[in-house]
Amino acid sequence: MKTKIFSFAFNRPDILQYQITSLKKFIVGEYDINIVYDTRDNQYYEQFKKICDDNDVVFHHHLSEPGGTPSFYNAQAIKWVYDTVISKEDDCYVMLLDHDMFLIDELDVHQEMSVYDIIGCLQTREKVKYVWPGLCIFKKSSVEDIEFDFYPQTVDGQILDTGGGTYKLLSNEKIKFMDTGVDYPEEYKGIDLKDEKITG
């Protein structure tokens, strides 16, 4: 089954090439890369479009509604892609990424998803659980009949950030979820995007 990768960018065209290169280097199996440029002013339109064209990846242009918060803008762009692109696809794995997430090792999505419907970075607010969409993979057929969204919201008195609406997925007993977790080392040194072992 093909993996459809969607990276959501709103600034920093200078790092997009590194993300695309790392994805092409480390994703195992059949995949498509989609870059979603979410903007209100089109400041970086030409730069993002050229990088996508040069790398033969799909470019989506989303004009978000002004007056929101960064979390709302991000959720609005993800929902737009889900409704206008993903919902029309054949069954596939869908990977959602922030524009500043980079693979640093091989990732076989088909193998990782063999027994799960969703994998991603779990967010917990008291008893409410949801998935952060900056690092998330789901099987389209597993979630398409469940009503959910990616917007921040308040649930059981808890304030949920971007991806908050995915609590409906994790509270569904049919969904098998794996938390990828996030390990924070005592001293974070970052990664060198110019290191050819990482980004070619």
Which residues fall in each region the model found?
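Conserved catalytic core of nucleotide-sugar-dependent glycosyltransferases
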Residues: 102-169
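N-proximal low-complexity "stem/linker" segments adjacent to membrane-targeting elements
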Residues: 1-22
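Short, acidic, metal-binding catalytic loop of nucleotide-sugar glycosyltransferases
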Residues: 21-31
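Short internal beta-strands
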Residues: 34-38
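C-terminal catalytic/acceptor-binding lobe
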Residues: 160-200
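Residues at the starts of beta-strands that form the adenosine-phosphate
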Residues: 2, 30-33
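Active-site-proximal specificity loops/subdomain of glycosyltransferases
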Residues: 41-90
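Short beta-strand-to-loop acidic/aromatic patch adjacent to the donor-nucleotide binding site
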Residues: 91-102
